[in-house]
Design a protein with these regions (language model features):
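Active-site-flanking beta-strand signature of metal-NTP-handling nucleotidyl enzymes
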Residues: 3-9
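Extracytoplasmic
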Residues: 1-2, 13-94
Length: 94
């Protein structure tokens, strides 16, 4: 399964994430939002994703339909496979 999603933004800390989520939830269903931890420039970060789409075209269309305020952080279309690989790459061994 290689679904697509929209990466809305990354947040460096919990307060920043909370502030962003409070804005995002005004425009899209919170149940369509996913957050995961990763590294950005070798620092811990939380990435916010929106939606799950069957193909790239559907995700790109949804991205075009986002309100301007949600486009402020330059969202991009990503594959679920790419996100899983990123998470696996940045997981620390137990």
């Amino acid at each position: 399964n290689n679904a697509f999603t929209i990466q809305l933004l990354g947040a460096d800390n919990q307060q920043q994430l909370k502030n962003h989520l409070n804005v995002i939830r005004k425009y899209v269903e919170i149940t369509d939002i996913f957050v995961y931890r990763t590294l950005a420039k070798q620092k811990p970060s939380m990435t916010v994703l929106y939606g799950s789409f069957a193909d790239r075209r559907a995700a790109q269309e949804a991205l075009k339909q986002l309100p301007t305020v949600l486009k402020a952080n330059k969202p991009i279309v990503r594959t679920a496979q790419g996100i899983r690989a990123e998470i696996a790459q940045h997981q620390s061994p137990q």
